Amino acid sequence: MNFSEEEEYSNRNAASSQKLGSLFKDNNAMSGNQSLQYTNNKTQSSANSNSPDVLISFPIHLYKFDNNKNEYVSSGSIATAIVGYKSSGKYQLLAYDNNKNYIVTVNITAQFNYSVTTIYGSFTDGNGQNWSMTFNSAEESTKYATHVAIAKCASGGYQQITFVDINNQSKTKPVANGDRVSIKYAGWLENNQRVGSLFDSNLQSETPFRFVVGEGKVIKGWDLGVIGMRKSAKRILVIPSELAYGKKGHSTIPPNTNLIFDLEVTGSKKKEGSEPSLPSLNGQPSNAPQQSLPTQLFDNSPVPQDDKANLLQRVAKLGRATGFTSPPPSDSENESNSRNSHSNNSHNNNNNNNSNSNNNSNSNSNNNNNNNNQNNNNNNNNQNNNQNNNNNNNYNNNNNNNNGYNNNNNNNGYNNNNNYNNNMNNNNGFNNGMNNGFGNNSMNGMNNGFNNGMNGMNNGMNGGFGMNGNMYTSSQSPQFNPMGTFGSAYNQQQALIGSGALVPIMPQHQQPSIIVASPPPPVQQAPPPTPAPAPPPPTPVIVQAPPAPVQSTTETIQILVEEKQFKKEIKHSIDQFNSKLDQVSSKFDSLAQPIVKGDVPISGVLLVQTLHRLVEDNEKLIKENVEKENRMVTLKENIATLHKKNEQFLEENTKMMESRNEAITDNVAQMRRQIIDLQKQKTLVEDDLADKQMLHTKSQSVINQLKRDYNTLQEELNSAKEENQKSIQDQEALKQAEKDYALKIRAFKKSLLDEKNARKSDIEKINSLEDELKDAQDSLTQAEKSNEESLKRLKLDMVRIKKRNDDKVSQLTLEITTLKDTLETERSALSSVQTLVENTRLETESKFNLLLIKKEEAIAAAELSLSEEQSKYNKLVQSNNQQIDQLQKLIDDAKKKLDHEKEEVIKSYKKGFAEGIESTKQENDLITTLQQQIQQLTTQYDDTKKSLIETKEKLSTLESQPPKTIVKEVIVKVPSDGTTVAVASSNNVDVAKEVKVCMQKVFVQVSESFDEDEEYSTDSIMSTFKDVIKRVTVEYIQEQKEKQQQQQEKEEEEVVEEEEKEEEEKEEEEKEEEEKEEEKEEEKEQEEEEEEKEVVVEEIVTIAEEVKEEEVVVEEPVTVVEEVKEEKPTPAIEEPVVAKSQTVVDPLSTKDDEDDDDDEDDYDDINEEDLKNIDAEIEKMQQEMGDELEDDDDEEEEKEKETAPVVTKSEVVDPLSSTKEESEEEEEEETKVEVPVLEEEKEEEETKVEVPVLEDEQEDKVESDVEEKIVEPPTLDEDDFEKVEVPVLGDDEQDEKVVEEPAPEEEEETKVEVPVLNKDDDEDNEKDVASDSEETPSTPPPIDDVEEEEEKEEKVVEQVKEEINETKFESSPFAVDEPTTTEEKEEEKEEEKVEEEEEKVVEPPTIDDDETTAPVIPSIDNSPRQTTTEEEESSTTAATTSTTTTSSTPVKPDEADTTKKTPKKTSFFDFDDSPFSAETETETKSTAASSDPFADTTSSTPTSTKKKDFFSTDDDSLFGNSSDIFDKPSTTTKKDPFDTDSTDDLFGSIKTNKESTSTASSTSNGGLFDSDSLFGGISVAKSNNNTPSRQKQDFSSLFGSDPTISPLTETEPEEKEIVLPL
């Protein structure tokens, strides 16, 4: 919709009028005069925005319109942009080329015309040149047009709506006020002169938005902005916030936000009755269209264009109420006021000036016209405000009236009509009458139309009568008219009234005869419907005049045209008159000045002449004035005629108004009657509604009751259905159960038939096996005879070889004694060095002990966690076994008869089967093993010869080497038993390097001190050696002191790192434990096969026993080790104990796998309900079992304490000594006696012992024979078996797993210790027959009396105590081994054990209590059980694992080494405390089986003495006695860092823990010195890996391989020491 400039101007300043008008309001909320506070009407720009802001830019193709050719001419492809200057509020449209040369620059104002057609945009610059732009797409064109509309609105200060039409070429009618339109729209928020976020849109919906234009149902900006649009055309509409949602905002629209809309009219419907119609005579309202008035009449109305007009407008609105919109001021208002000030006495001139100002101040506005009447004195301001609101206040303020004018004030919404003034200088009487008649508040809606139609008439009257009235006309009606149809009818009537006759001008002393006196009191009219309430205004006063005929609309228009022309003529004449008056006034001014300046006198003639001229001029002026007065008279006559016409119009208007009022009153009365009727109908309808509601509530209650009844019935129906379904399911379950029971009965019948058939077949097999048994027994007797003969021959050969070796050994001992004497002489010379060695040793010991304490604490914590996990695992296993037992019992009732028959068949089958297999298998195996023994003895004999030859060679080298070079190694190699493996290995690497460096220095200095050509004496050589060694040692000690400070700082960091490593090792150990558990499961599968092999091996063991008894050789027995649970080493150093004989329960004899399979089948047949009942019973049984196990533990501990002797410890106490509890446990273990059992006892008692190791070939033969000959008995239920003890492997001590074994009660007897023959010992045994009998006179022959045997054990223990007290050595675990147990003693123990096992479940064996030596047959290397890799590879290692089990679980290398006690520290060459002197003392022991004092014994493998390294602390260190010879076998990982079996030697030749399990050869050469480590030589280690060596003084660390290797085994501990002469 196109707005006039006046409307834009008035809208823009509405806020200022409210501020000024607020001064005159009673309830003013504002503080002070808000008009005095300056606020810019334009939007505040951002600070320092002098630089232009580019709103948008696009590439275009520009065209310029050529008026001559009447076509567009292309200007090329350039770019366009819209630029805004925020500081000035100025916006420009720019078109520029690539060089930024501006081609077009246009200022964008609110009136800027920009049209868009698809991709074309057209505009006109300030020079009137038309331009057209082509965009690349319609989207770019639309965006550009949107920003043009924003810039237009922003340039006008966001005071009015602006728009840009797009494709507005439709020929349909434009939308007008009152039309119903359908619109598709999209709305965005305006953000800093740019398009912001989308807040609403209906483009996606199918139905458009419909509303009636002008009803106020939408925001005011839409009511105004939609007008003028055509169907199918689009419009970009920018609405200021004042015309949108204002300060309140709306949902997603913030307050004071300008809106941007893209509107498209999809349809419109014209308002009904919009066509023009004449006013009806019967008083009915009719519509007079405003469009019928020609707009050409008002084209010359002034428009404010500058800041001066702005200021005048604000002044004109002074005193207006804030609720009204101020009228636009005229540009000539200031002129009229200034001219009136110069002519106070000339009323006509003043009126002419006012009329001229009125003609120049006609404006078009949205608001009603206002009359501003200003006095000549500028004191009387008659302001008439006619607005859209109901309250029209006509303020006629005539203040400071020097001429006696009255004050006409209309402040309260009513017109106080002052028709007569005392003096008519200003003719205010008629003006007031006109104000009252035409500007009354009673017809607010009519005033709009009247003022719009009659502004021209008012201006004419004011000009004719000299009135100071300023009437402003509007070319258009306001956009929103709340009166609806009433306003249009009054417009025509008011227009007709305005064309009446004019009142002629009267003299000053007269009064107008036509103007009547004061009007009668007003008549109250019903107010029209308005948006806001207002007091009812008075009715207008009508001037009485003769009636005039009703004129048509065309005549009215003609009269208005004539009036306009007349006003133009009057205006022209008044302008001429004013110009002449100006000339006259200027002349008077010039005449007032003196002609001649100064005090020069003027002559009278000149004065007279001038006076004559002045008189003539005055006369001329008087004549001209008279002429002008005459003209004025004629003009007044014309005005009178016009006034008469005006009166006619007024009369007509009054008639129309009366008829109109009557019609309105009739309508109102009729409406009142209709309202009364409607109210009566309403009461009737309400009564009916109340009755209907009562019925509704009653029916609703009935419906609710029926619903409740329905719900109850529905619930009952559902419950009945559920019961029915349950009964059906129960029936189906019962049917299924019947079918299952029938199937089970059939299965039982089938199984019964199968068992009968199997019984028959078993009987047949038993008969056949009995026959085979007889044959096997016959063959066995023959084999035994032949065997005895071959054994006698072997014994004779062994005795011969032994004697030969003894002779050679005696010679070597003499040589060793000589060497010893020479070494003793040198010891005194090294006393100073000895002190240094002792100091360094103590320092390193303290460091190692500190590290050991931390390590042991971590190990103890890990041990506890592992024990808890293992106990949980064992409990689960035990509970599972108990559940299986309970489930098995449920089936026993149905199988009792069948089981009884099975037991008889199985027992008979077992006896025959065992006897037959043992007789056949063992006979062949023993022959082969004896042959292998002979071969081994011959090879060993050859090796001993070679070793003797090598020792002689090494003795010669001994004499040439300086012995004092040993000191350097001694300084570094300090024994420390308490260190952990990880620390020891790292220190050994460093020590080895340092020793190499030191030895190289010694070698270099010695080589430099001697010349090859010269000869030296022994004294000089020794002195030079001493000097060199002293220098090197002193230098080394100084370097070490410097390094110690650095190392101490590093050690703290290393401790932290070691703790982290320990945690990682724990995790690895946990993983290994998981792997071990998996291996345990695999071992259980192999138990059945091992059980069968065990039967074969037992016979072999008995035969080996007979061989030993016939040889009358006292052998060191190795007790059978029960299957011991692997656990982490305890941190305490364990005391030496004597192993106690324990009951050996073979874990390989069970058939858990088969039984478990059977149990699973049985378990499937049982329902879950039965299992729940059984679980409760199992829990009770577990509690009872736990109580019994605790009681058994207490009983066993008490028994052990009763027999525990007190053992004194070594003088040198280990810093990590064991606690009291551990010492007590160790003391209890000392009383354990190893009892070797003869063959007859084993056969009768069928005691389960650990299976000896068989060779691979023999094992394959045994397995193949068993598979061929042995027929497995039928699978039996677990109730058929006796419950025996089977220890379960784990990391912690746990309860024994109770399993069932098909074995008689005799198999549950006490464990027997079987003396072991090392497979390398046969050759030595033959040599030692005589010597052993002499050296062990305390060993009694086998006797049958149990009491004597017990007394013997006590004596042995006492002897051990005495020996420990004398020599301060720790007793050997084999010191009280007695191979002379009898059958009577074993039978008594068996009976006691059986009785105890029947009453309770025996506790699992602990590591400390259950460690026993394993029986190993000399000629057999492999057995069905799986041993550790260290056991399989070397039978001669002194520090092998003490916990080798029969479960095939590999023991970790760390756990495999035996913990060494801290040896007693002595001087370097103190040979009195050396192992040689200790050996002579231990020879006097009267033990049952003398132990090798130099053997690092183990509990699971046949151990032999290993080679003694010169600096090794495994046996006797250089600084003390042997503390390891009596060490108890343990599972702790504590190792001597210099242990030859656990860590590297100083010179890198000894294998580490991992290497100890890799090859068998490395274990025998553990103490050899690698000569390449110091001087690049080649190692001269022995190659006989299997030949056990005797502990000795090791010189290999300096001189190469050991020259004193002894072929003697561990079974020859009583041989005299070989003393080599130095």
From Swiss-Prot:
Compositionally biased tracts (Polar residues): 277-303, 1519-1532, 1581-1609
Coiled coil, from the record: 607-827, 854-961
Acidic residues bias: start-end ranges: 1050-1093, 1152-1168, 1185-1199, 1222-1260, 1320-1335, 1380-1412
UniProt signal peptide: none
Keywords, sorted A to Z: Coiled coil, Isomerase, Methylation, Rotamase
Modified residues (Omega-N-methylarginine): 314
Biased segments, Low complexity type: 335-432, 1435-1449, 1465-1504
Top EC class, one word: isomerase
Cross-referenced Pfam families: FKBP_C
Entry superkingdom: Eukaryota
Protein EC: 5.2.1.8
Described purpose of this protein according to its UniProt entry: PPIases accelerate the folding of proteins by catalyzing the cis-trans isomerization of proline imidic peptide bonds in oligopeptides.
Family: Belongs to the FKBP-type PPIase family.
Name the UniProt record assigns to this protein: FK506-binding protein 5
